UniProtKB/Swiss-Prot annotation:
InterPro entries: Ribosomal_bL32 (IPR002677), Ribosomal_bL32_bact (IPR044957), Ribosomal_zn-bd (IPR011332). Residues 7-19 have a biased composition (Basic residues). It holds the Pfam family Ribosomal_L32p. This is Large ribosomal subunit protein bL32. GO terms for molecular function: structural constituent of ribosome. It comes from the Bacteria. One of its GO terms (cellular component) is large ribosomal subunit. GO terms for biological process: translation. The keyword Glycosyltransferase does not apply.
Length: 61
């Protein structure tokens, strides 16, 4: 069984945890449907930059 030689310092612990944070995504409102969505992603209804996406049409059938 692995056993540590010494207790990690507060600095080492902080450096390890420096990447453990929650990212808040930038939100946008679609111009046509007035729907809130993550920026640079399609809305739930399939719109991106005010246009219906082709990919959404194929997946919804």
């Amino acid at each position: 069984m692995a056993v540590q030689k010494s207790k990690p310092s507060r600095a080492k612990r902080g450096k390890r945890r420096s990447h453990d944070h929650v990212i808040q995504h930038a939100l946008s409102i679609d111009k046509l449907s007035k729907e809130i969505h993550i920026r640079h992603h399609i809305t739930k209804k399939g719109y991106y930059k005010g246009k219906k996406t082709l990919l959404f049409h194929l997946l919804s059938k």
